[in-house]
């Protein structure tokens, strides 16, 4: 699928320079299929000033023609992918690289666009308080030519040590002074968009609601919670489950735990419980993916939960506290067969999920676009190709491989054949 660009201007710069570097011109993407309104339609996409525009007033009111027409060669145009849980990548670990966090986040943001990700939440695992105080204020608000930063996902430290996973147990804390405990731990709540906590460890019934009032999405995870614990947290305002099936009680017919929230009748009317799920072909069995999809499709969100080895070549890499070995698309503790995290990029997760569940292409894409945007209540700006939304999108071939990635109407990545 070749993308061909034709511009009307007589300016000396080449058409490719125009289209790749400017968001101010009126752009018309033709010969494409749009993911819009839960289906794939044959239509043109119009972009100007970093947003998707309605062509009708442009034609009839402004009487303006497109400055550049981009022939997409029959490609699918989908909203840009949104990753709500990613611990690092390209040799960067958000939780440990405290001295170089600005450069590290920029490296990851620019790397993610290769896999179609246009927005993400840098995720910090359970850490000492002084690490939060150092890292949080230094994470950049934006990165030129990189995926947008929606805010930080603080995965811990208010979790259950019995389900700590790879989180350092000595850094786990309890919420003993209500909201003030969180403020003291993180230093500030301003940059935080998501907090993962264990609901059974929350003794103050007002904490979750207070976080939600501040625009923070409360996620449940790394937990031994019963279903009733989870239902109580949802009734208090929690709306997300962190990496479903991982670091929580397994489903049991007498008490299904947090997994039971997917079918709970105690969820307040009109509220959706969302859940992240890792479809990297390693962490979650295909049958588990199908169960989650068929039980609660409107809440399913694809996340990578990727670690620092994402995007690195095969071999041994010395990152953070342990040497890692990347082989056969998996990350191991070097010299062992112990898996140490996911390294599948988002576009691969979308393809794996679509194949495992046999869902529609549109649904697989929406699980990485619309659903995370809805979870964060930003669906008016991100996650769709609706008129007025941000012009963050990805061109895909029929196998859902990334051809190019666009942020605010500017091309930030093109796949080289």
UniProtKB/Swiss-Prot annotation:
Keywords: Carbohydrate metabolism, Hydrolase, Metal-binding
InterPro entries reported in the protein's UniProt record: Amidohydro-rel, GlcNAc_6-P_deAcase, Metal-dep_hydrolase_composite, Metal_Hydrolase
Pfam families, sorted: Amidohydro_1
Highest taxon in the source lineage: Eukaryota
Protein name: N-acetylglucosamine-6-phosphate deacetylase
Molecular function, one GO term: metal ion binding
Similarity annotation: Belongs to the metallo-dependent hydrolases superfamily. NagA family.
UniProt EC number: 3.5.1.25
NCBIfam families attached to this UniProt entry: nagA (TIGR00221)
A single BP term in Gene Ontology: negative regulation of UDP-N-acetylglucosamine biosynthetic process
Keyword match Metal-binding: yes
Active site annotation, chain numbering: 305 (proton donor/acceptor)
Residues that, per the record, bind a divalent metal cation: 155, 222, 243
Positions bound to substrate: 166-167, 246-247, 254, 280-283, 339-341
SUPFAM superfamilies recorded: Composite domain of metallo-dependent hydrolases, Metallo-dependent hydrolases
Cofactor comment: Binds 1 divalent metal cation per subunit.
Catalytic reaction list: N-acetyl-D-glucosamine 6-phosphate + H2O = D-glucosamine 6-phosphate + acetate
Cofactor(s) listed: a divalent metal cation
């Amino acid at each position: 699928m070749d993308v061909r660009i034709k511009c009307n201007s007589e300016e000396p710069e080449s058409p490719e320079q125009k289209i790749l570097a400017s968001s101010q011109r009126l752009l018309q993407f033709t010969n494409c299929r749009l993911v819009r309104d839960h289906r794939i339609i044959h239509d043109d996409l119009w972009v100007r000033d970093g947003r998707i525009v309605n062509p009708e007033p442009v034609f009839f009111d402004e009487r303006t023609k497109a400055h550049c027409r981009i022939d997409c060669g029959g490609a699918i145009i989908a909203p840009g992918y949104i990753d709500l849980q990613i611990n690092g990548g390209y040799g960067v670990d958000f939780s440990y690289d405290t001295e170089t966090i600005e450069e590290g986040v920029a490296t990851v943001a620019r790397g993610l666009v290769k896999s179609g990700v246009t927005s993400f939440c840098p995720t910090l695992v359970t850490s000492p308080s002084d690490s939060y105080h150092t890292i949080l204020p230094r994470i950049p608000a934006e990165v030129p030519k990189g995926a947008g930063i929606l805010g930080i996902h603080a995965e811990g430290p208010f979790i259950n040590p019995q389900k700590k996973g790879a989180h350092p147990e000595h850094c786990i804390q309890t919420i003993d002074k209500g909201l003030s405990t969180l403020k003291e731990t993180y230093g500030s709540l301003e940059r935080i968009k998501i907090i993962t906590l264990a609901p059974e460890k929350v003794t103050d019934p007002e904490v979750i609601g207070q976080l939600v009032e501040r625009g923070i999405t409360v996620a449940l995870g790394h937990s031994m919670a019963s279903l009733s614990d989870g239902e109580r947290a949802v009734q208090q305002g929690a709306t997300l489950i962190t990496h479903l099936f991982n670091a929580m009680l397994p489903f049991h017919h007498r008490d299904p735990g947090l997994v039971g929230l997917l079918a709970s009748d105690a969820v307040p009317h009109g509220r959706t419980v969302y859940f992240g799920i890792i479809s990297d072909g390693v962490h979650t069995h295909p049958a588990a993916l199908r169960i989650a999809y068929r039980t609660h499709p409107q809440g399913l969100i694809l996340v990578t939960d990727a670690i620092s080895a994402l995007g690195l070549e095969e071999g041994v890499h010395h990152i953070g506290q342990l040497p890692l070995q990347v082989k056969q698309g998996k990350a191991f503790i070097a010299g062992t067969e112990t898996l140490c995290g996911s390294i599948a990029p988002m576009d691969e997760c979308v393809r794996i999920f679509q194949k495992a569940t046999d869902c529609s292409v549109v649904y697989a894409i929406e699980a990485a676009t619309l659903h995370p945007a809805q979870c964060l209540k930003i669906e008016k700006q991100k996650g769709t190709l609706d008129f007025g939304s941000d012009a963050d999108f990805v061109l895909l071939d029929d196998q859902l491989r990334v051809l190019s990635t666009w942020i605010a109407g500017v091309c930030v990545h093109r796949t080289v054949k």
